Swiss-Prot record:
It comes from the Archaea. This is DNA-directed RNA polymerase subunit Rpo12. Belongs to the archaeal Rpo12/eukaryotic RPC10 RNA polymerase subunit family. Zn(2+) binds at C13, C30, C33. Keywords: Cytoplasm, DNA-directed RNA polymerase, Metal-binding, Nucleotidyltransferase, Transcription, Transferase, Zinc. It comes from Pyrobaculum aerophilum (strain ATCC 51768 / DSM 7523 / JCM 9630 / CIP 104966 / NBRC 100827 / IM2). The gene is rpo12.
Length: 52
C-alpha cells in the first residue's frame, strides 16, 4: 500500500514541508517560521471529467 505524501507551503516564508514535519509543533503551523497560514500544494496531475 503506497501512502500519498501531502505537501504544504508556508504563506510567509514559502518553504515546502510535509504533514509529518508540521506535526512537530502543536496546532497547524509552519515548522520553520511558526506562521499559522499554510496552503496545501496541489498535485501536478490534471483530472479530466467527461461532460454530460
Amino acid at each position: 500500500m503506497t501512502e500519498e505524501r501531502k505537501l504544504y507551503v508556508c504563506m510567509r516564508c514559502g518553504r515546502i514541508f510535509s504533514k509529518s514535519e508540521m506535526e512537530i509543533l502543536p496546532g497547524i503551523r509552519c515548522p520553520y517560521c511558526n506562521f499559522k497560514i499554510i496552503m496545501k500544494v496541489r498535485s501536478p496531475m490534471v483530472k479530466r471529467i467527461p461532460a454530460i
